[in-house]
Structure formats: structure tokens, C-alpha cells
Amino acid sequence: MSKSTILAIFMIVLVLGKVTKETQGQEMCRDILMKAKNCDEGTCDTLCKQKWKGNGSCFPNVYTYRKSCLCTFPCKT
């Protein structure tokens, strides 16, 4: 193989390795807020933005028989 072919293969492997590393931090994490209180959509979304810089939505929590706030946000690497 010529030097240019080997260099091209090396560069492709290097670029693919960088792209793979960058996309690993894109995973989403979750946290449940307002377990003791009944969830309000506006309050839930505001709390999530303040605490995690994420989005919040209410869901029926079968363990507390109330609506809880589910906060979804990008995981930190």
C-alpha cells in the first residue's frame, strides 16, 4: 500500500473515534421530583429547568397514588 492510502485509513479511524466519543454524552437521565405533593405541569417544568436544565412533565405515580414530576435532562459525562 502507498503512504497516502495508509494515511487516509488512519485519518478515517481517527475521525470515527472522535465522533463516537462525542455522541456518548448524549444519553438522557431522569429524576422524579415532587413525590410528596400532587404535580402541577408549570411548577414541574420550572423545577426541572432550574435543577437540571431539562424538561418536566407530570405522570401518575402508582406508589404514591398522586401525580409526580418526571424530569428528563442530558446526562453529564
UniProtKB/Swiss-Prot annotation:
UniProt-listed Pfam families: SLR1-BP
Gene Ontology BP terms: defense response to fungus; killing of cells of another organism
Localization per record: Secreted
GO cellular component: extracellular region
Residues in the signal sequence: 1-25
Alphabetically ordered keywords of this record: Antimicrobial, Disulfide bond, Fungicide, Plant defense, Secreted, Signal
Entry annotated with the keyword Acetylation: no
Keyword Repeat: no
Disulphide-bridged cysteine pairs: C29-C75, C39-C58, C44-C69, C48-C71
UniProt cross-references to PANTHER family, sorted A to Z: DEFENSIN-LIKE PROTEIN 122-RELATED, DEFENSIN-LIKE PROTEIN 184-RELATED
The family this protein is said to belong to: Belongs to the DEFL family.
Name of the protein described by the UniProt record: Putative defensin-like protein 118
Organism of this sequence: Arabidopsis thaliana (Mouse-ear cress)
